[in-house]
């Protein structure tokens, strides 16, 4: 007999080999119909998994948070089966088909056919047939020899099988289709009916440009139609907000893939926004006791050997050599900050030292993964390093969390925290890692922050906290990182003198709030759909003279606004007022003033907002004061 412990800690005994499906049926017919998988001793398993020992169990239904990982994985298999049916099993070579955020994909190598979105309708129809057939999904475990025989005509699967160390390999069957997979999967193909194929693209096998280019189909799936509809509407809205379209359109930035791939050019309007972001960041950092520094772009490669970046990061670095000195373009700012620290004698009275830099870094990314401002090769970090005594580190991390909260609240962002622990490829001893991880946990808990743990995803030199912000479309973006580091101070022999003049090792905290200024800029463009709050808007007020005779007075009024620190543009073209209004609305200028006889001869104006609202008879003095306050307070919403 086996003892089964439920989430409410109640215990029930069953015969050896009982399955979660049988347990669900014993509880209620409704639960049996709705269950799709089970969490057994913390691991996701199929409903038909035999339980041979005392275990904890949680039955998973379509409403559970983990459910999308299961049903979208099955949908990837259904799509692969449909593609094989349509184009022929002998012509379709299967690669991989994982679940990703909000969806899934599958990579194919199809002889004699290039997939396009025109193929989607017939693939979707075949998928619907497979779903309607409600084919049972069966997991079988085979040895390596049997797996090789099963997949003898599937070269990509064979490559994966050959690399597996274990001899027991799981294969999932649905009718005449089978795939190499760890699972778990739905009990049958009929459980989830609402899906959509989204796009097709090229993808190198295993992400290596030296390998063959495969064809990747992306899709998504939901248990309810309204959930799918909401997601598809969100995708359409995201396309409208795409920073790669809005950026050039609003004169913010441009990309030159031929001349400088992954290295954005910032245009006049974009530079204004970046300068505002940096000015705000400097103001907040000064408040929290940081000093700003600047470090060189190119430094001797021996620095990167000493820091450990050479061993862990050289494939992502750029190099040059002059006067027989091999140099590296910095991929990170931390070694430079360490050299500044070591430039002077440091006493315990000097600590903590909070060193801050807008540091331009360069990291090689494959051309295939470059993506607007989100994935680039050159970017600016709002990078800081805090050097402190071990007794100060918890308090310093709490202060970084407070600083992060202050900055994100200014942009209206909510965020979640993820604690990432020691990866396999790491520096230093386990005891130091445990001490660092514990300090991060305590800081989060004392800050009353909920967090989840991401095992094995820390940096090579220390555990970290990542903060993911949620934008206006509900999408999550990783921005802030806080990393605790005992390794770099050791490698660089960093010391401070304690109260007894004994040399002690400081702790180093790495942190960036925006993360990358470029990436954060892209997030802001999409979050606000280009309609920045007034304080960030490149042009804050546009004045639109009704005709040429009002141009001079309009310019006089613009100079008054400029003297008050307001960014103004006067559209003195010969175009009609209606055209001028439409043009400024397309530029997403917060406020427009149509300037005619009344505006020239009185102290009142009519204000038009980019949303199309009109506010009449506002005194010029009041307008100026209200806009100044809106800018000073960095309000998210328009005052008028």
Curated annotation (Swiss-Prot):
Domain TGS: 1-61
Cofactor, how bound (note): Binds 1 zinc ion per subunit.
EC number: 6.1.1.3
Coiled coil (residue ranges): none
Region (Catalytic) location: 242-533
Domain of life: Bacteria
GO cellular component, one term: cytoplasm
Catalysed conversion reaction: tRNA(Thr) + L-threonine + ATP = L-threonyl-tRNA(Thr) + AMP + diphosphate + H(+)
GO BP term, example: threonyl-tRNA aminoacylation
Residue positions binding Zn(2+): 334, 385, 510
SUPFAM superfamilies assigned: Class II aaRS ABD-related, Class II aaRS and biotin synthetases, TGS-like, ThrRS/AlaRS common domain
UniProt keyword annotations, A-Z: Aminoacyl-tRNA synthetase, ATP-binding, Cytoplasm, Ligase, Metal-binding, Nucleotide-binding, Protein biosynthesis, RNA-binding, tRNA-binding, Zinc
Entry's localization field: Cytoplasm
Segment forming the signal sequence: none
Essential cofactor(s): Zn(2+)
Family of the protein in this entry: Belongs to the class-II aminoacyl-tRNA synthetase family.
Function: Catalyzes the attachment of threonine to tRNA(Thr) in a two-step reaction: L-threonine is first activated by ATP to form Thr-AMP and then transferred to the acceptor end of tRNA(Thr). Also edits incorrectly charged L-seryl-tRNA(Thr).
PANTHER family associated with the record: THREONINE--TRNA LIGASE, CHLOROPLASTIC_MITOCHONDRIAL 2, THREONINE-TRNA LIGASE
HAMAP family in the cross-refs: Thr_tRNA_synth
Name of the protein this chain belongs to: Threonine--tRNA ligase
Organism: Petrotoga mobilis (strain DSM 10674 / SJ95)
GN (gene name): thrS
């Amino acid at each position: 007999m086996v003892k089964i412990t439920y989430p409410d800690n109640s215990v029930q005994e069953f015969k050896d080999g009982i399955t979660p499906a049988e347990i669900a049926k014993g509880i209620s017919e409704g639960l049996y119909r709705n269950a799709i998988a089970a969490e057994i001793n913390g691991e996701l398993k199929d409903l038909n998994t035999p339980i041979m020992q005392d275990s904890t169990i949680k039955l998973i239904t379509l409403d559970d948070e983990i459910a999308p990982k299961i049903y979208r994985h099955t949908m990837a298999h259904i799509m692969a089966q449909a593609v094989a049916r349509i184009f022929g099993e002998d012509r379709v070579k299967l690669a991989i088909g994982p679940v990703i955020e909000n969806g899934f994909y599958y990579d194919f190598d199809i002889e004699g056919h290039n997939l396009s979105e025109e193929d989607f309708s017939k693939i979707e129809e075949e998928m619907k047939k497979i779903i309607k057939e409600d084919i049972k999904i069966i997991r079988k475990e085979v040895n390596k020899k049997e797996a090789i025989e099963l997949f003898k005509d599937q070269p990509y699967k064979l490559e994966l099988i050959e690399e597996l160390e274990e001899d027991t390999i799981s294969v999932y069957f649905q009718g005449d289709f089978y795939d190499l997979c760890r699972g778990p999967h739905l009990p049958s193909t009929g459980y989830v009916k609402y899906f959509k194929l989204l796009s097709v693209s090229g993808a190198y096998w295993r992400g290596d440009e030296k390998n063959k280019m495969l064809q990747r189909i992306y899709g998504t799936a939901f248990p309810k139609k309204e959930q799918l509809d909401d997601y598809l509407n969100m995708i359409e809205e995201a396309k409208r907000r795409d920073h790669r379209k809005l950026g050039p359109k609003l004169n913010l930035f441009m990309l030159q893939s031929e001349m400088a791939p992954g290295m954005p050019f910032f245009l006049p309007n974009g530079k204004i926004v970046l300068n505002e972001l940096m000015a705000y960041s400097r103001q907040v950092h000064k408040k929290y006791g940081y000093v700003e520094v600047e470090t060189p772009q190119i430094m001797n490669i021996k620095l990167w050997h000493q820091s450990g970046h050479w061993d862990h990061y050289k494939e992502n670095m750029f190099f040059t050599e002059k006067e027989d000195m091999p140099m590296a373009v910095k991929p990170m700012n931390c070694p430079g900050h360490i050299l500044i620290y070591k430039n002077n004698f440091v006493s315990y009275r000097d600590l903590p030292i909070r060193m801050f830099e807008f540091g331009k870094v360069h990291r090689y990314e494959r051309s295939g993964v470059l993506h607007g401002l989100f994935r680039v090769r050159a970017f600016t970090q709002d990078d800081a390093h805090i050097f402190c005594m071990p007794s100060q580190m918890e308090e310093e991390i709490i202060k970084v969390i407070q600083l992060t909260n202050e900055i994100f609240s200014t942009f209206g962002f909510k965020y979640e925290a993820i604690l990432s622990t020691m990866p396999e490829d790491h520096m230093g001893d386990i005891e130091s890692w445990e001490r660092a991880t514990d300090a991060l946990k305590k800081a989060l808990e004392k800050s009353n922050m909920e967090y989840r743990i991401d095992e094995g995803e820390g940096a090579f030199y220390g555990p970290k906290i990542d903060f993911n912000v949620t934008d206006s479309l509900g999408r999550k973006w990783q921005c802030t990182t806080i990393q605790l580091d005992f390794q770099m101070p050791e490698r660089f022999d960093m010391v401070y003198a304690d109260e007894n003049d004994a040399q002690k090792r400081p702790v180093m905290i790495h942190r960036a709030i925006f993360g990358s200024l470029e990436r954060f800029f892209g997030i802001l463009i999409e979050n606000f759909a280009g309609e920045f709050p007034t304080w960030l808007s490149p042009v804050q007020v546009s004045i639109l003279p009704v005709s040429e005779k009002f141009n001079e007075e309009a310019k006089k009024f613009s100079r008054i606004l400029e003297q008050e620190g307001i960014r103004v543009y006067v559209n003195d073209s010969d175009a009609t007022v209606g055209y001028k209004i439409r043009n400024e609305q397309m530029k997403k200028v917060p406020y427009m003033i149509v300037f005619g006889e009344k505006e020239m001869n009185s102290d009142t104006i009519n204000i038009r907002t980019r949303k199309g609202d009109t506010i009449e008879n506002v005194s010029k003095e009041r307008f100026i004061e209200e806009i100044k306050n809106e800018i000073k307070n960095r309000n998210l919403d328009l005052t008028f």
